[in-house]
């Protein structure tokens, strides 16, 4: 990701009058999710949420939604999902992984780590198998990062201490863009 950001900055410098949203550092990113995504989730669930699970790419979605949900109910548990092969949030080191959309190999400035109650690292294999299973069994075509988030949510739901709890998982994209990738190559 660092290389892509560096290249974007080069293009910005070469094109006077252009603008770069800088989604990894722009406070408008989490603010948008605080203003829209968080309230939508709260409303759709009738305020009954025990755990919220989302992958961490820019950190904006997780941070904005978490801030909103915790203001409504401080007991809501916020669960961040990261690649097992690049577990920076868990205190590990950056590394290559296949979970496009999460695990930028640095901790984004837009991520408010104080709102995260738990971090679940997910392997490429578990994310891929979960995304494929979701498509085959449920008819819902989700992407790689969605597979990781769903794997984490399913793992949480299997924990006896979470029996009867409402777990909300954010599935950020469709699997259409991954149809020709390793995700659906099998």
Q: Which ranges hold each PLM region?
A:
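Terminal helix/beta-alpha structural elements that buttress the NAD(P)+-binding lobe
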Residues: 51, 76, 81, 140-142, ...
């Amino acid at each position: 990701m660092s290389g892509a950001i560096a290249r974007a900055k080069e293009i910005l410098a070469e094109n006077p009058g252009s603008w770069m949203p800088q989604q990894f550092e722009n406070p408008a990113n989490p603010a948008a999710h605080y203003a829209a995504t968080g309230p939508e989730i709260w409303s759709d669930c009738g305020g009954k949420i025990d755990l919220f699970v989302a992958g961490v790419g820019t950190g904006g979605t997780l941070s904005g939604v978490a801030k909103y949900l915790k203001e409504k109910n401080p007991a809501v548990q916020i669960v961040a999902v990261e690649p097992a092969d690049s577990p920076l949030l868990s205190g590990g080191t950056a590394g290559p992984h296949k979970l496009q959309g999460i695990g930028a190999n640095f901790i984004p400035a837009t991520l408010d780590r104080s709102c995260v109650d738990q971090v679940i690292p997910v392997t490429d294999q578990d994310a891929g198998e979960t995304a494929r299973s979701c498509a085959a069994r449920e008819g819902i075509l989700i992407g790689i990062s969605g597979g990781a988030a769903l794997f984490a949510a399913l793992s949480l739901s299997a924990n006896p201490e979470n029996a009867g709890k409402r777990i909300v998982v954010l599935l950020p994209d469709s699997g259409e863009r991954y149809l020709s990738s390793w995700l659906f190559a099998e």
